[in-house]
């Protein structure tokens, strides 16, 4: 059984925020609270500890009271670089990731991913949702993985790989269907942020 205390949560806040005009998405306020803090509050009850991957505004993220780690590979290499930084620092057997702009993530995310890993004998687990037309959409940036996946991730990144889906598919992968696609909504633009503020 994968216990809560065996899992560390990693909030991915290391991107450029290019779709948000270069602003740091995780620090943008939603109802007066930074988006990364919303994500942190949703994830905290599900894990034994938390850390943040960020590459700028480090003092602001450190003020959240959890460890902050920068990418160990250069040039904003994407979320996999953040996952690598987390795996390098993770002190528990398991790590779960979530992007900083996912303030509505499910409160049973970790439990359901862990159950699927155990039931299916999988190595990694990611959520799957259905779009309005019933098409499956994987949500690979939300991923429960063992720390032992570090070596395969190093090898994949060293070979120039950057796609989470491709790396994840090279493992025994459990895909877990979640009914509420909106729970995985990313807020990528300032317009989207304003729309959520108005709700």
Curated annotation (Swiss-Prot):
GTP binds at residues 12-14, 25, 53, 71, 101. GO terms for biological process: bis(molybdopterin guanine dinucleotide)molybdenum biosynthetic process. Pfam families: NTP_transf_3. It catalyses: Mo-molybdopterin + GTP + H(+) = Mo-molybdopterin guanine dinucleotide + diphosphate. Its cofactor is Mg(2+). SUPFAM superfamilies: Nucleotide-diphospho-sugar transferases (SSF53448). Transmembrane segments: none annotated. Its EC number is 2.7.7.77. It is found in: Cytoplasm. GO terms for molecular function: GTP binding; metal ion binding; molybdenum cofactor guanylyltransferase activity. It comes from the Bacteria. Mg(2+) binds at residue 101. GO terms for cellular component: cytoplasm. Keywords: Cytoplasm, GTP-binding, Magnesium, Metal-binding, Molybdenum cofactor biosynthesis, Nucleotide-binding, Transferase. Monomer. Belongs to the MobA family. Transfers a GMP moiety from GTP to Mo-molybdopterin (Mo-MPT) cofactor (Moco or molybdenum cofactor) to form Mo-molybdopterin guanine dinucleotide (Mo-MGD) cofactor. The N-terminal domain determines nucleotide recognition and specific binding, while the C-terminal domain determines the specific binding to the target protein. This is Molybdenum cofactor guanylyltransferase. It comes from Cupriavidus taiwanensis (strain DSM 17343 / BCRC 17206 / CCUG 44338 / CIP 107171 / LMG 19424 / R1).
């Amino acid at each position: 059984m994968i216990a809560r205390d065996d899992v560390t949560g990693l909030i991915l806040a290391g991107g450029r925020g290019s779709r948000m005009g270069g602003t740091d998405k995780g620090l943008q306020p939603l109802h007066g609270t930074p988006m990364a803090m919303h994500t942190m509050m949703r994830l905290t009850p599900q894990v034994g500890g938390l850390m943040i991957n960020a590459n700028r505004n480090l003092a602001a993220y450190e003020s959240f009271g959890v460890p902050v780690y920068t990418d160990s590979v250069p040039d904003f290499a994407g979320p996999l670089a953040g996952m690598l930084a987390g795996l390098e620092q993770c002190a528990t057997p398991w790590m779960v990731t979530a992007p900083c702009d996912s303030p509505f993530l499910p409160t049973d995310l970790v439990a359901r991913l862990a159950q699927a890993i155990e039931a299916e004998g999988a190595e990694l687990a990611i959520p799957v949702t259905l779009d309005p037309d019933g098409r499956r959409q994987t949500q690979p940036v939300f991923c429960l993985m063992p720390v032992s996946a570090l070596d395969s991730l190093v090898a994949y990144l060293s070979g120039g790989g950057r796609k989470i889906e491709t790396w994840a598919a090279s493992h025994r992968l459990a895909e877990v269907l979640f009914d509420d696609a909106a729970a995985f909504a990313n807020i990528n633009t300032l317009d989207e942020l304003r729309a959520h503020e108005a709700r």
